[in-house]
A protein has these predicted regions:
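A short helix-breaking turn/cap at a secondary-structure junction
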Residues: 1-78, 122
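Short, well-ordered beta-strand elements
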Residues: 17, 206-213
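Short helix-loop capping/hinge segments that flank enzyme active sites or metal/cofactor-binding pockets
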Residues: 54-63, 106-159, 198, 202-209
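Acyltransferase
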Residues: 72-95, 116-127, 151, 155-172
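Short glycine/threonine-rich loop-to-helix capping motif typified by GTGT followed
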Residues: 73-76, 101-112
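Short hydrophobic alpha-helices that are characteristic scaffold elements of the AMP-binding
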Residues: 187-189
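Short beta-strand->loop structural element characteristic of the AMP-binding/adenylate-forming
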Residues: 194-196
């Protein structure tokens, strides 16, 4: 449930646990899932994790372009594919939906603007520290000029995007992506859950992650 969490985007906001291992995440998730009567977007769906799956039966799809064109740390992300392959995981290239999620990403800005509309209307947004062109106060202000027709049309495309991605994911068990890949925006719009796990460190010792969807 998102009850008690500060709203940013009603149709995209999601919460999830953080832990040191996937096993710990699964235990926490098992404890917090399900309706609590305070968030109408929560569905009562089954969840189980026993950690006993045979890796050789798991089909992992990946968008090759994300790995080939990773802006940084390409070697680390390609190494993930090598490790999975060595464990017997079935890797297969997949294509993403035809609809570019970037063209409807403004849905987030519009919904965030609505959530913080009182700040904008009362000029309290001027008290926020960051006031750059891409900072939230200006995002809130600019979003007020987005026509309702465009917002509705964008959500129509979003529905098609959800259908397309759901269809493609039926061909695999898990979709793997890099941090610079399209999955962050894509899953924000489509709602597919993700798990981010560590996959090494950069030259300065900062942790790197890889996303399983």
């Amino acid at each position: 449930s998102r009850h008690g969490v500060m709203v940013l985007s009603w149709s995209m906001d999601k919460i999830g646990p953080m832990a040191r291992s996937v096993e710990d995440l699964a235990l926490i998730f098992q404890a917090i899932i399900g309706p609590d009567g305070k968030d109408r977007t929560v569905f009562d769906l089954p969840f189980s994790y026993d950690g006993q799956s045979d890796l050789k039966t798991i089909r992992v799809g990946y968008y090759k372009k994300s790995f080939d064109e990773a802006r940084r740390h390409k070697d680390k992300y390609l190494a993930v594919l090598d490790v999975l392959s060595s464990l017997g995981v079935k890797l297969q290239e997949i294509e993403l939906p035809e609809i570019d999620p970037e063209i409807i990403s403004f849905i987030l800005n519009v919904e965030a603007s609505a959530a913080f509309d009182e700040l904008t209307r009362t000029n309290q947004d001027e008290l926020m520290v960051r006031q750059g062109q891409d900072a939230w106060p200006n995002v809130f202000r600019q979003a007020r000029f987005v026509p309702a027709v465009e917002y509705i049309q964008a959500n129509r495309l979003r529905s098609l995007l959800i259908e397309q991605l759901t269809s493609k994911l039926k061909e695999i068990d898990v979709y793997l992506d890099t941090p610079s890949g399209p999955s962050l925006l894509l899953t924000n719009l489509t709602g597919q859950p993700t798990v981010v796990v560590p996959c090494g460190f950069d030259d300065k010792g900062h942790p790197l992650g890889i996303t399983f969807i």
